[in-house]
């Protein structure tokens, strides 16, 4: 019996520890519902909000209550309206604040990128800001949902239609057409959407290339010499190794001037295409057009392990080649920009966190692209909308209550949709390399052979090389620091 009691106590303690280990989950005010079904009674797939949850979003709940309203929470608690300063205390009420048992995450979907064809910078911008379906309407509806007035032209009753797009310095302004007159309070004060501060960042994973034109390897030099065994025993335990540095000369041309504005976020290495040995790097935060050609040096080696009979020599042949390669290339650049909304806020309802009712003129800038700060980040404000006092700009819970969660998710996904511009050009390179070291049939020798024009190398055990290497000539062909060595094999 004592053993059973101890086991039961252990289960209780384990349950408490598991409950304590579970982290608190956010409660999004836009998903709250007030049910008038009795004390702590909710509709299907809802549960009562507990005291801790209500405390975390008290200002949001109180803002949705009548002056003297009292509504229930879980476990015998109630929350009281603004006339009671939102007090939370034990009590009972006929209505209950409830929350979904399986709440929607409410995340902003990430859409596939909007690809803009390659062109000059102004071409890329023009295509973006004149795209009605993918840009003008989504940004216009964003302004409308936030409470900006008159986000449309005089010749249409719909948001985002009859809009004029004009160049403004290095940016663009989108505003409803004001021709022909209008009716309504300050209807001539159309909300404007300014698009400015464009930036372009190279996406290295987007590399594509067209048809590759690659020349067959061209023989530029043949070096012939001898491996000579002057000893009385066959020699097969030595490696003959050719080492050299070779330069690959490369160049790239950029089809459009937009490449001058494209930067690399991280150090970028050019992808290898074909058989050329190439190592091109562009430093982080550099213009794509800052490096359009150069030379890269690669250290290479070839080895062979010949078997040379006693008092014999075998011919050694090394062939040196060059190869050319060229192809058109394309990368994508991620486009980012500032989106500035300017106009007056509607008195009948707006999403500024203080909800002013005096129709104030309001400017606010969002950054579409990499995170800059909280005030300009739609995604940050949206994700933190469950924390009262954290988001001191727009009341996204209000926009959801007014327009619905799916509507806001769909609109913000379009506003935040990635935009990519094509960067195209042509690439070419020339490289040099050595073929395999070829070994011929042995030839008997009567005595050691020497040549004043040859490189004479010995392993100190009777095997030596006589191979002519003209450093100046080889350098002119693109081969530098050429060396031949004969060394005991490491894995005999």
UniProtKB/Swiss-Prot annotation:
<keyword id="KW-1015">Disulfide bond</keyword>
<dbReference type="InterPro" id="IPR037015">
    <property type="entry name" value="APT_N_sf"/>
</dbReference>
<keyword id="KW-0964">Secreted</keyword>
<keyword id="KW-0472">Membrane</keyword>
<dbReference type="GO" id="GO:0005576">
    <property type="term" value="C:extracellular region"/>
</dbReference>
<dbReference type="InterPro" id="IPR055267">
    <property type="entry name" value="Aerolysin-like_C"/>
</dbReference>
<feature type="propeptide">
    <location>
        <begin position="446"/>
        <end position="492"/>
    </location>
</feature>
<feature type="signal peptide">
    <location>
        <begin position="1"/>
        <end position="23"/>
    </location>
</feature>
<keyword id="KW-0204">Cytolysis</keyword>
<protein>
    <recommendedName>
        <fullName>Aerolysin-4</fullName>
    </recommendedName>
</protein>
<feature type="disulfide bond">
    <location>
        <begin position="182"/>
        <end position="187"/>
    </location>
</feature>
<feature type="region of interest" description="Interaction with glycans from host GPI-anchor">
    <location>
        <begin position="346"/>
        <end position="355"/>
    </location>
</feature>
<feature type="site" description="Important for heptamerization">
    <location>
        <position position="374"/>
    </location>
</feature>
<keyword id="KW-1043">Host membrane</keyword>
<feature type="site" description="Important for heptamerization">
    <location>
        <position position="390"/>
    </location>
</feature>
<keyword id="KW-0732">Signal</keyword>
<keyword id="KW-0354">Hemolysis</keyword>
<dbReference type="InterPro" id="IPR005830">
    <property type="entry name" value="Aerolysn"/>
</dbReference>
<dbReference type="GO" id="GO:0016020">
    <property type="term" value="C:membrane"/>
</dbReference>
<feature type="region of interest" description="Interaction with host N-linked glycan">
    <location>
        <begin position="68"/>
        <end position="84"/>
    </location>
</feature>
<dbReference type="GO" id="GO:0090729">
    <property type="term" value="F:toxin activity"/>
</dbReference>
<keyword id="KW-1032">Host cell membrane</keyword>
<dbReference type="InterPro" id="IPR016187">
    <property type="entry name" value="CTDL_fold"/>
</dbReference>
<feature type="site" description="Important for oligomerization">
    <location>
        <position position="155"/>
    </location>
</feature>
<comment type="subunit">
    <text>Homodimer in solution; homoheptamer in the host membrane. After binding to GPI-anchored proteins in target membranes and proteolytic removal of the C-terminal propeptide, the protein assembles into a heptameric pre-pore complex. A further conformation change leads to insertion into the host membrane.</text>
</comment>
<keyword id="KW-0800">Toxin</keyword>
<keyword id="KW-0843">Virulence</keyword>
<comment type="function">
    <text>Secreted, cytolytic toxin that forms pores in host membranes after proteolytic removal of a C-terminal propeptide, leading to destruction of the membrane permeability barrier and cell death. The pores are formed by transmembrane beta-strands and are approximately 3 nm in diameter.</text>
</comment>
<dbReference type="InterPro" id="IPR005138">
    <property type="entry name" value="APT_dom"/>
</dbReference>
<dbReference type="Pfam" id="PF01117">
    <property type="entry name" value="Aerolysin"/>
</dbReference>
<dbReference type="GO" id="GO:0020002">
    <property type="term" value="C:host cell plasma membrane"/>
</dbReference>
<feature type="region of interest" description="Part of the transmembrane beta-barrel after proteolytic activation of the toxin and insertion into the host membrane">
    <location>
        <begin position="256"/>
        <end position="288"/>
    </location>
</feature>
<comment type="similarity">
    <text>Belongs to the aerolysin family.</text>
</comment>
<keyword id="KW-0812">Transmembrane</keyword>
<dbReference type="Pfam" id="PF03440">
    <property type="entry name" value="APT"/>
</dbReference>
<dbReference type="GO" id="GO:0031640">
    <property type="term" value="P:killing of cells of another organism"/>
</dbReference>
<keyword id="KW-1134">Transmembrane beta strand</keyword>
<feature type="disulfide bond">
    <location>
        <begin position="42"/>
        <end position="98"/>
    </location>
</feature>
<dbReference type="InterPro" id="IPR005831">
    <property type="entry name" value="Aerolysin/haemolysin_CS"/>
</dbReference>
């Amino acid at each position: 019996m004592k053993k059973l009691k101890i086991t039961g106590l252990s289960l209780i303690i384990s349950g408490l520890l598991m409950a304590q280990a579970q982290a608190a989950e956010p409660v999004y005010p836009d998903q709250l519902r007030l049910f008038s079904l009795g004390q702590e009674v909710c509709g299907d797939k809802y549960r009562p909000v507990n005291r801790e949850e209500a405390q975390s979003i008290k200002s949001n709940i109180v803002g949705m209550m009548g002056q003297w309203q009292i509504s229930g929470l879980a476990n015998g608690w109630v929350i009281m309206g603004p006339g009671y300063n939102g007090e939370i205390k034990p009590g009972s009420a006929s209505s209950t604040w409830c929350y979904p048992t399986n709440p929607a995450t409410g995340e902003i979907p990430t859409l596939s990128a909007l690809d803009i064809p390659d062109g000059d910078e102004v071409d890329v911008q023009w295509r973006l800001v004149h795209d009605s379906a993918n840009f003008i309407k989504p940004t216009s509806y964003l302004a409308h949902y936030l409470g900006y007035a008159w986000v449309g032209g005089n010749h249409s009753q719909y948001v985002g239609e009859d809009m004029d797009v004009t160049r403004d310095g290095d940016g663009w302004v989108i505003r409803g057409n004001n021709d022909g007159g209008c009716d309504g309070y300050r209807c001539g004060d159309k909300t404007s959407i300014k698009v400015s501060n464009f930036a372009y960042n190279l996406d290295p994973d987007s590399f594509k290339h067209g048809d590759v034109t690659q020349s067959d390897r061209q023989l530029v030099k043949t070096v012939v010499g001898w491996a000579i065994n002057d000893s009385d025993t066959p020699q097969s335990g030595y490696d003959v190794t050719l080492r050299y540095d070779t330069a690959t000369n490369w160049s790239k041309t950029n089809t459009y001037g937009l490449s001058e504005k494209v930067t690399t976020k991280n150090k970028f290495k050019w992808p290898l295409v074909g058989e050329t040995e190439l190592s091109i790097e562009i430093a982080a935060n550099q213009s794509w057009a800052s490096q359009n050609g150069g030379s890269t040096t690669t250290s290479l080696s070839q080895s062979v392990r010949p078997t040379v009979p006693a008092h014999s020599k075998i011919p050694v042949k090394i062939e040196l080649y060059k190869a050319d390669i060229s192809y058109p290339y394309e990368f994508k650049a991620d486009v980012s920009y500032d989106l500035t909304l300017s106009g007056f806020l509607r008195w009948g309802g707006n999403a500024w966190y203080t909800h002013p009712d005096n129709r104030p003129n309001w400017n606010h800038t969002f950054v579409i692209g990499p995170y800059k700060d909280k005030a300009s980040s739609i995604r940050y404000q949206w994700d933190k909308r469950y924390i009262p006092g954290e988001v001191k700009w727009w009341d996204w819970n209000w926009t959801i209550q007014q327009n619905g969660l799916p509507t806001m998710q769909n609109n913000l996904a379009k506003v935040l949709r990635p935009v990519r511009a094509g960067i195209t050009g042509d690439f070419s390179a020339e490289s040099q390399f050595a073929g395999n070291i070829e070994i011929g049939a042995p030839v008997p020798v009567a005595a050691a052979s020497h040549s004043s024009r040859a490189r004479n190398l010995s392993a100190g055990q009777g095997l030596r090389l006589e191979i002519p290497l003209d450093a100046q000539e080889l350098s002119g062909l693109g081969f530098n620091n050429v060396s031949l060595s004969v060394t005991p094999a490491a894995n005999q």
